[in-house]
Amino acid sequence: MNEMTHRTKTRPVKVGNLTIGGNNELIIQSMTTTKTHDVEATVAEIKRLEEAGCQVVRVAVPDERAANAIADIKKQINIPLVADIHFDYRLALKAIEGGIDKVRINPGNIGRRHKVEAVVNAAKERGIPIRIGVNAGSLERHILEKYGYPTADGMVESALHHIKILEDLDFHDIIVSMKASDVNLAIEAYEKAARAFDYPLHLGITESGTLFAGTVKSAAGLGAILNKGIGNTLRISLSADPVEEVKVARELLKSFGLASNAATLISCPTCGRIEIDLISIANEVEEYISTLQVPIKVAVLGCAVNGPGEAREADIGIAGARGEGLLFRKGQVVRKVPEEIMVEELKKEIDVIAAEMAAEREKEKEKEKEKEKETQEQ
């Protein structure tokens, strides 16, 4: 059996201003729920997704009206845009012409070779990657006849077949997804895919369900896959506001230490010792830090006796007591604050630390740019 390709060993593929694969961080994606031809509504939803932390967004392109809207949408957003194409290769060509950053197709349902070749040539000319979207629910008839039902081996065979179509046309800017609604099937398919090729993998549990059930199902499946070192980009598929997909994705990546651009909340489960309204405070603080783009850890704890010690890794936190709270940094108490202002004081400290982290990150970026410049001049 081939060795599994770790996410850091996959081929880097450019998508707009991002690079997926290689040594780059996992990228969070989502998909709009609007009619793509409704530019105003689509842009408004994408703006909300951007604010929530979405890094790549996909839109359905079922008809010419949607394809013609791509250029207008692109002008008004800040993140890479992906066109989801099925059956009609001409829609892919129009989307590419409109400035799309990536095309998601299934080469098997685009039609004859000359149609696939037309899409590949257009993508190659513009430097646009193609995602091959394998789905357990829409495998080719001959694969289902061979295996009897959707299997991980059948999904990998489908992926390899489609990859070969593109490779035969000398196209290698490829990303692959192996989606299934069955968690165990998805885990097996992604693991076998990581052994079969080194293209970046887009992760997802398709049709996972409503906000609550879908979150649990996606976390179970994608968590197991991520823990194996597999995956370069992911989408949480929920029957909910797509902003919720982004929130869940950020939390999932933070749980595995795979997001350096997201804040983390640590809070205790409450008990009879608590003298403050911990649940509402934790929810308020979680909402406050939800859009921060720095890896700050914030703790909200109910017990002033054990709190600071239990959250030593937190950059900043509060531990409640009767009528007051302890404000602490890295497990060390900084000062006592009255209960009525402790949340506001915590927010002030969060702002200071977040600003420091952001400034430090900018310094690191400048250093990297200087190193690159020196390397190019040598």
Swiss-Prot record:
| Cofactor field | [4Fe-4S] cluster
Does the record carry Iron-sulfur as a key word? yes
Return one GO MF term: 4-hydroxy-3-methylbut-2-enyl-diphosphate synthase activity (flavodoxin)
Quote the record's binding site residues for [4Fe-4S] cluster.
Answer: 268, 271, 303, 310
- Assigned EC number: 1.17.7.3
Q: Where is this region: Disordered?
A: 359-378
Query: What InterPro entries does the annotation carry?
Result: Dihydropteroate_synth-like_sf (IPR011005), IspG_bac (IPR016425), IspG_bac-typ (IPR004588), NO2/SO3_Rdtase_4Fe4S_sf (IPR045854)
Pathway field: Isoprenoid biosynthesis; isopentenyl diphosphate biosynthesis via DXP pathway; isopentenyl diphosphate from 1-deoxy-D-xylulose 5-phosphate: step 5/6
Record key words, sorted: 4Fe-4S, Iron, Iron-sulfur, Isoprene biosynthesis, Metal-binding, Oxidoreductase
- Cite a single GO BP annotation: isopentenyl diphosphate biosynthetic process, methylerythritol 4-phosphate pathway
Cofactor: bound how, per the entry note?
A: Binds 1 [4Fe-4S] cluster.
Key word Transferase present = no
Catalysed reactions listed for this entry: (2E)-4-hydroxy-3-methylbut-2-enyl diphosphate + oxidized [flavodoxin] + H2O + 2 H(+) = 2-C-methyl-D-erythritol 2,4-cyclic diphosphate + reduced [flavodoxin]
- Summarize the protein's role: Converts 2C-methyl-D-erythritol 2,4-cyclodiphosphate (ME-2,4cPP) into 1-hydroxy-2-methyl-2-(E)-butenyl 4-diphosphate.
State the family named in the UniProt similarity comment for this chain: Belongs to the IspG family.
> This protein is called what?
4-hydroxy-3-methylbut-2-en-1-yl diphosphate synthase (flavodoxin)
Q: Which organism is it from?
A: Bacillus cereus (strain ZK / E33L)
Q: Upper lineage ranks?
A: Bacteria, Bacillati, Bacillota, Bacilli, Bacillales
